[in-house]
Amino acid sequence: MAKYVFITGGVVSSLGKGITAGSVGTLLKKRGLRVSIIKMDPYLNVDAGTMNPFQHGEVFVTDDGAETDLDLGHYERFIDETLGEQNSITTGKIYSHVIDRERRGAYLGGTVQVIPHITNDIQERLVRAGERQDVLIVEIGGTVGDIEGQPFLEAIRQMANRVGRENVVYCHVTLVPWLEAAQELKTKPTQHSVQELRRIGILPNILVCRTSRPMDQEMKNKIALFCTVPSEAVIEVRDEPTIYNVPFSLHRQGLDTQILRALGLPCGGEPDLSDWHRVVDRFMNAPDAVEIALVGKYVQHKDAYLSVVEALYHAGVHHGVKVRVRAVESAELESADVGESLRGVDGVLIPGGFGARGIEGMIGAIRYAREEGIPLFGICLGMQMMVVEYARNVCALAGAHSEEMDPASLHPVIHLMQEQAHIDKMGGTMRLGAYACDLEPGTLAARCYGVLEISERHRHRYEFNNAYRERLEAGGLRVSGVCRGRNLVEIVELPGHPWYLGGQFHGELKSRPTRPHPLFADFIGAAIRRRHGGEGR
């Protein structure tokens, strides 16, 4: 039977509960335990797939096709495990399941209520998810006191009775703010947040205090006194130069040891963090840097392309260079000098997205990178716009476009997938999850991967139109990767260009700090060569 670590948050959102959960997972896994992590989001959406990236950040897609909160990306990167649909729980998913069961008569005419039906459904999912784990870490989204989160908090309170108090740890992430006027840290918000938790019957074992200034022992003792925890259970976490430093900070303060003791697990020895030491050391002490232009539709929201940026950092660590990301709003390029906006960059990356806004700016950036020999990497929509740009400006297909942006295009080089034609619902209906792809020998893609059979994650409705494949290939574009069994073009590249590759998939979702994605690693290698005056490969 699994033991459980529940991570809640108080005072304000965005304190780093996901990073805390991932860091705890890292420390426990490095001690040899089987660990998994679940995110429980209190919103009524069934999943994150239809949510606005400006509000919610990126959608993280799992191998099994679940569209989830970006925190699952943190979890996968920190514990280096492949997660799935069962690792993402939302209010919408729970209520949909319970209402469906009620309609089928599963409750035998009983009155269906939040307690016990909703809370039991939540608990049953946690128990199932923990069946093959030593420790299941569960992050509850939002903050204590939010009305939406009450059923989840009640469910995790009841879990202590269900599995035994000795098998449960409650870790509360809270804020200790610095008041500039008073020139001091304030503990009252943390006290009130813990009081709110205690009001519903949850007594936290550990407090993770986010603060911008050092906390002295007197302050930790004060928090411990008013919140009824040992002073050593008051953990200070300040902003780090890289999120991959957080496990070291938590370990130095004994967080992993306290969790193991509370759960009755062996806590002798030290976690093997040698690979993480190498990552952080190479990140912090990189002697050189490259600059990559990220030309996207949602760059104003720092989390909209979170996995892309992390994958670039991973590739930089692999090569021992810092990667500086220049965020370029594609819509602004439509009325700006593209050359001036991209001046001095060592590579251009065009990420995914949806809709017509900013598309011509993307196409302008693609043309500039192609003509100037700048390493160019397109992901999903980025790959599609690379095809559009090449069709227009090299193959003389005037008006070539994607049916998504121009349904009446004379040359729809990107078109709606056949199986999408009769779909009238938006959520969960795209081509989602991992699919196999065969690579052509002797291509850039094959060299990057080092194998001819790969699997990557997808999230799209539109695809390369094979009616134009012969003409585009005759014009010099090369198809180097095709989905096995259905002839769907997955990768295009341009022989003779320093580095030019577009993939229909989202390789960034599988990148790890200790194991960068092959395409990102080779892309940054090409950027380094350009920086130092060499060719891209």
What is each of the regions a protein language model found here?
Residues 55-63, 240-244, 350, 371-377, ...:
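Short beta-alpha connecting loops at secondary-structure transitions
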